[in-house]
Regions:
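Conserved redox-cofactor binding core of oxidoreductases
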Residues: 107, 113-193, 198, 247-259
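Conserved N-terminal glycine-rich FAD pyrophosphate-binding loop of Rossmann-like flavoproteins
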Residues: 50-85, 89, 249, 258-263
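Glycine-rich loop(s) and the adjacent beta-strand/alpha-helix scaffold that form part
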Residues: 201-257, 298, 317, 398, ...
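N-terminal Rossmann-like FAD-binding beta1-loop-alpha1 element of flavoenzymes
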Residues: 20-46
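Glycine- and aromatic-enriched mobile tails/lids
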Residues: 2-18, 32-35, 51-53, 58-60, ...
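An anion/pyrophosphate-binding glycine-rich loop and adjacent beta-alpha core
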Residues: 230, 236-352, 418, 422-424
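FAD-site-proximal beta/loop scaffold in flavoenzymes
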Residues: 173-190, 194-196, 351-390
Length: 594
């Protein structure tokens, strides 16, 4: 955020009173609002940065996990939890993991009751497919557009319950004294009006921070760390920020070709591999046989991503800096039925997946870290909740595919239950906070608008994303991380003097994003430097082994004089049932796909 001194002239702003303010209109925010409405809380407002139903949830393709046992009746929530902990390299919060896995069979059936368009077996049951590093087929899906189907279902349910939404509003700051939250400040992206929301409870369901990298699966104006930065600025702690998931299969394209360039890094769903897709290097070798002969293409995402990065780095990459993903051994009808959106996307670009492979390379996809919360999704700031990708704790050092959508609906319910039990009417921002926090912040925003600074916003963001890819990417070491922090400081200086348009302009939105991204980027770099081991998605070439003494979570707190301080805490132990599942050591039978 621009720190230049504003004038003292008062800033006009609207005020809106609400008992519960939900920031984020994706699956997590929608499900929390539904739970509140079903429990009789009608004074709720859901805010979205885009039009109704247009959230990042719709970009989640492959599926949503739950131990239904459609094909594998021996599956269970305890085994699902064990797989999640193993994939997270045992630094997940076991309580949060079990909260999600225990709920998911019921949540999947509930979505079915609400009309979700699941893909189905021949006898009409909810179909489930393989996803990487899972012991059984537990990923329910709607073709390869599961997130879109999920959000449509939740939006329809919310509308049936008359849940109020407000579109095209961006929150820029929480109103917090560090002990409790009292509301939030933002602006209407259509007309430029500043708004103070007096809220008794605030729920951050604002996504993650994967777009702080220059190759990412998000749209450029989302997943820029809004939720984490807002919470951190409001006095909440962050956790596990060093763990960034690089999805193995983002599109690798000719970036000089205007038709292909916008697709660089965009997700090629894991469902392609779950349905039998195979990875080959430029020499025609199915290289996962060298890295993971048992699980092959369906090993953990961090394993597959590092394998692809190594193939590219050692000169066995394809023309556009990737490897080949090939599902052409499947019939065209099968691909069109099971992967309709992927098939259509590549058809539109002139590639027939049924006839030829596509080029893929790792891409930033998901931040396992986020805001530290308790078992109900509440932060250490009273009445401030964080759910979905904004929260930390469920995924540990690496995330199972299909668990992100599961987390959104499970913790939407959990947070909604807790809030409904104690909601106490609209908030009221104390006069002192309004004078010391709200009004100075609004003057800062006004001063940032129409500023004729020296640096273009797009150039500042591009530099930030480039340095994160170079210094905090798939492979890390101390020297590079320290250089990344130095470069980040220089970017921060440039961000203080940007050329910004009016409040309704895209450049103003992105300038606000820049402030959020700087917080998230610093936490990722500092956490990666602090964790002197390799674990899951965090790989240090100068500390390549996993250290049992580092089975701890890194927390990030705001320092009294600015910046952040780091501390570590040990991880809790799982329940007896989940520990038994861990001890049994269930393992995917990959060869069922051959």
């Amino acid at each position: 955020m621009d720190e230049r001194a504003p004038t003292d002239e008062p800033v006009e702003y609207a005020r809106e009173d609400v008992s519960v303010l939900v920031v984020g209109a994706g699956a997590a925010g929608a499900r929390a609002a539904i739970e509140l409405a079903e429990r009789g809380v009608d004074d709720v407002l859901v805010l979205g940065k885009r039009g109704h139903g247009d959230a990042h949830t719709t970009w989640a393709r492959g599926g949503i996990n739950g131990a239904l046992g459609t094909h594998d009746p021996e599956d269970s929530p305890a085994i699902h939890a064990a797989d999640t902990l193993n994939e997270g390299h045992l630094i997940n919060d076991p309580g949060k993991v079990e909260t999600v896995t225990a709920q998911m069979p019921e949540r999947l059936r509930e979505l079915d009751d609400w009309g979700m368009a699941y893909s189905r077996t021949d006898d009409g049951a909810i179909d489930q497919r393989f996803f990487g590093a899972q012991s059984f087929r537990r990923t329910a899906f709607a073709g390869d557009h599961t997130g879109e189907s999920l959000l449509n279902t939740l939006v329809d349910r919310a509308q049936a319950l008359s849940v109020p939404y407000r579109e095209n509003v961006m929150i820029t700051k929480l109103v917090s004294d560090g002990e409790a939250v009292h509301g939030a400040v933002g602006f209407d992206m259509d007309d430029g009006e500043f708004v103070l929301f007096n809220a008794g409870t605030v729920v951050l369901a604002a996504g993650g921070h994967a777009a702080i990298y220059n190759r990412h699966t998000s749209r450029d104006d989302e997943n820029n760390g809004d939720g984490a930065a807002l919470a951190f600025d409001g006095g909440a702690s962050l956790m596990d920020m060093e763990f960034m998931q690089f999805h193995p299969t983002g599109m690798a394209v000719d970036e000089a070709d205007p038709e292909w360039a916008p697709w660089s890094g965009r997700l090629v769903t894991e469902a392609v591999r779950g349905e039998g897709g195979r990875l080959f290097n430029a020499e025609g070798e199915r290289f996962m046989e060298r890295y993971s002969p048992d699980q092959m293409e369906l090993d953990a995402r961090d394993v597959v991503a590092r394998a692809i990065a190594r193939e590219i780095g050692e000169g066995r990459g394809t023309e556009h800096g990737g490897v080949y993903l090939d599902i052409s051994h499947r019939d065209a009808d099968f691909i069109e039925e099971r992967l309709p959106r992927m098939y259509e996307r590549f058809q539109d670009l002139g590639v027939d997946m049924a006839e030829e492979p596509v080029e893929v390379a790792p891409t930033s996809h998901y931040g396992m870290g986020g805001v530290a919360v308790d078992d109900h999704g509440e932060t250490d700031v009273d009445d401030l909740f964080a759910i979905g990708e904004t929260m930390a704790g469920v995924h540990g050092a690496n995330r199972l595919g299909g668990n992100s959508l599961a987390e959104t609906v499970a913790y939407g319910v959990v947070a909604g239950e807790r809030i409904a039990d104690r909601v106490d009417g609209p908030g009221e921002v104390p006069d002192a906070l309004r004078e010391e926090t709200v009004e100075p912040h609004l003057r800062d925003l006004r001063a940032m608008a129409d500023n004729d600074g020296a640096n273009e916003v797009d150039a500042v963001l591009a530099d930030l994303r480039e340095l994160m890819w170079e210094h905090a990417g798939i492979l890390r070491d101390e020297s590079s991380l320290r250089e990344g922090l130095d470069r980040l400081a220089a970017v921060r200086d440039r961000a203080a003097d940007m050329r910004v348009g009016p409040v309704t302009s895209e450049s103003f939105e992105l300038a606000v994003d820049a402030g959020f991204m700087l917080v998230a980027a610093e936490a990722v770099l500092r956490g990666a430097l602090e964790r002197e081991e390799s674990r899951g998605a965090h790989y240090r070439t100068d500390h390549p082994d996993t250290d049992p003494d580092w089975r701890r979570n890194v927390y990030f707190d705001a320092a009294d004089v600015g910046g952040m301080t780091l501390r570590t805490e040990p991880v809790d132990q799982p329940s007896d049932a989940v520990q038994a599942a861990l001890d049994e050591g269930h393992e995917l039978d990959y060869h069922q796909l051959e």
